[in-house]
Amino acid sequence: MRKKQWVAAALVGLAVILVGVGSGNVKTRQTKKDKQETTQIVSGVQIITEDGKKYYDFQDVKENNYRARLLDQVPRNSYDFSNLALDEETGYLSYKDTKGKVSAKKGIDVSEFQGETIDWQQVKESGIEFVIVRLGYRAYGESGALVEDAMFEQNVQGALDAGLEVGVYFFSQAISATEAVEETDFVLEHIQPYQITGPVVYDTEEIKDDTARTDQNTREDFTNFCKVFCDGVKQAGYQPMIYANMKWMAFTLKMEELTEYDFWYADY
C-alpha cells in the first residue's frame, strides 16, 4: 500500500494534523508587559502566536491541558476534523473532502484483548476495509522479553481470509538501539509468512500509572529507536509507521527528525 493512500485513510499521516492552513477568527490580547498574543481558530483548533512563535493547546485523555510549540520544520497536514461526518445508519464516521466525497478508509485495530473469536467475514461485511493487528510487545520488566500477541496468527490469517487489508503494530519498550533492532527483527520474522500490505507500526508511548523500563530514556533515545525500527522495516520492503498521541509527539518525540515517516495519531 502506497504511503499516499494511507495518509488519506483513517490512519492519519503526519502528526501535526490540527494545524492545517485555513482562515478563522483572529483575536489579539496583551498577555504580559510588551507581549502580544494573537489567537486564531483553525479547523476548530486554537493557534496562539506570541512573540512571533506559534503554539497550540490540547488536552490528554485525562483532560489535562497542554500548550506546545508548532514546529516550522514539520510539514502541516491537511486533515480537518470538521470534515468528519457520522453515518447514522452504520454508526461509523466518514471523512469527506471539500467536494463531499468520502476520502478515507474505515479500519480497526485488534489484539488478544478482543477475545479468541472474531467473525472476520462479519467485520468485512460491516464496511471495515483494513485491520491493524497487534503482533506483540516487549515486556515492562527488567528482562524486557519479546512476546508474540496470543492471537496474532489467528487474527492475521482470519483478516486476510476475509479479504481485508492487514497491517501490524508492535509495542516497544526498547532502552537501546540494539533492542530496537531486536524488535525490528522480531516483527519482520513474524510477518514474513503473510501478505502484509498495510503499515508496520512502531508503538511507543507513555506508561501511565505504572513504572516502565523506558522511564530513563531521553527524547533522543525514543526518536532514534523510531528511526531504527522504521528504517529496518522500510529496507525490508514494508511501509513503516509510528503510533503516538499528541502529548508524546509534542514533548517526547523530536518530530522534526521524523518527517519522512507516517504517523498513526492516537486520540480517544
Per-region residue spans from a language model:
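Conserved, mostly hydrophobic/aromatic
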Residues: I108, V123, A159, Y202, ...
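Structural recognition of the beta-strand scaffold that forms the well-ordered cores
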Residues: K106-D109, E129-R134, E165-F170, G198-T204, ...
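Acidic-and-aromatic substrate-binding clefts and catalytic sites of carbohydrate-active enzymes
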Residues: G107-I118, G136-M151, Q173-E182, K247-F251
